[in-house]
């Protein structure tokens, strides 16, 4: 796209070294990679490959030891802790394997939480949260508590919460790890829709090849380096896969 030639995520020879007493662990060894606005990228690799460290740096939860990380053109190393927290809240939506919902709080209130930190007023908070829940197919469930929702529905609330501040990027770390295969594909259908219809950049960490298959691009880490990076030639469309899968009763869509 013409005006979007600058990458949203830019890693320039990024190293990350952890000092564990007398031992130094080289988690990232000179990573250079660009992710452009509107991409849907799966990050793969074995445990200890560097993929989690990469995600932590992308999400401004950690900083490079050497090298540069630019997020939307901003050099993250130059930011204060407070500025980093603001960026995490406004520019990045996080989705994890564990849903991290507040149990005594409704789906709507859980979704609203990031807007409270962003300083939005009540009415706008409600509107944004309702819109986000609608996008993930949870209209009519706004006042349900997490205990009244299935695992897949709870993960949808977590995605709505990640969307509510209209972030530039969604970072999803093993988001289907706790879900059965049918529900996992439903979640991937939401990510594909958000990516295609709303242009949201999605970076997804997974160790499952059948989940990475829904991304447009796959980056494979090994020993702190990128071993493979390229378009996903055999990309699956979740809406085509869903009808072929058996459903579990509690995950079936309600009759219209």
Question: Which functions belong to the PLM regions below?
Answer:
Residues 1-3:
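Pre-NBD coupling/linker segments of ABC/ABC-like ATPases
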Residues 225-253:
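Conserved beta-strand-loop-alpha-helix hinge in the C-terminal portion
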Residues 7-221, 226:
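ABC family nucleotide-binding domain
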């Amino acid at each position: 796209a013409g005006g979007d030639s600058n990458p949203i995520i830019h890693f320039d020879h990024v190293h990350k070294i952890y000092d564990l007493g007398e031992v130094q662990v080289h988690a990232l060894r000179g990573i250079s990679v660009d992710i452009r606005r509107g991409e849907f990228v799966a990050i793969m690799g074995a445990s200890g490959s560097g993929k989690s460290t990469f995600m932590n740096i992308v999400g401004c939860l950690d900083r490079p030891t050497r090298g540069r990380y630019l997020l939307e053109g901003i050099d993250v190393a130059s930011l204060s802790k407070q500025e980093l927290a603001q960026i995490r809240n406004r520019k990045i939506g996080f989705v994890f394997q564990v849903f991290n919902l507040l149990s005594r709080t409704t789906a709507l209130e859980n979704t609203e939480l990031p807007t409270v930190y962003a300083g939005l007023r009540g009415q706008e908070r409600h509107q944004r949260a309702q819109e986000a829940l609608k996008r993930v197919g949870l209209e009519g469930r706004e006042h349900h508590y997490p205990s009244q929702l299935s695992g897949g529905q709870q993960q949808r609330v977590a995605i709505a919460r990640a969307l509510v501040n209209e972030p530039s990027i969604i970072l999803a770390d093993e988001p289907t790890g706790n879900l059965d295969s049918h529900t996992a594909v439903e979640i991937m259908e939401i990510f594909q829709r958000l990516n295609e219809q709303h242009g949201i950049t999605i970076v997804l960490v997974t160790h499952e090849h059948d989940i990475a298959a829904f991304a447009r691009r796959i980056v494979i880490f090994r020993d702190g380096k990128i071993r493979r990076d390229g378009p996903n030639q055999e990309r699956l469309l979740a809406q085509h896969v869903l009808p072929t899968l058996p459903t579990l009763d509690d995950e079936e869509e309600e009759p219209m």
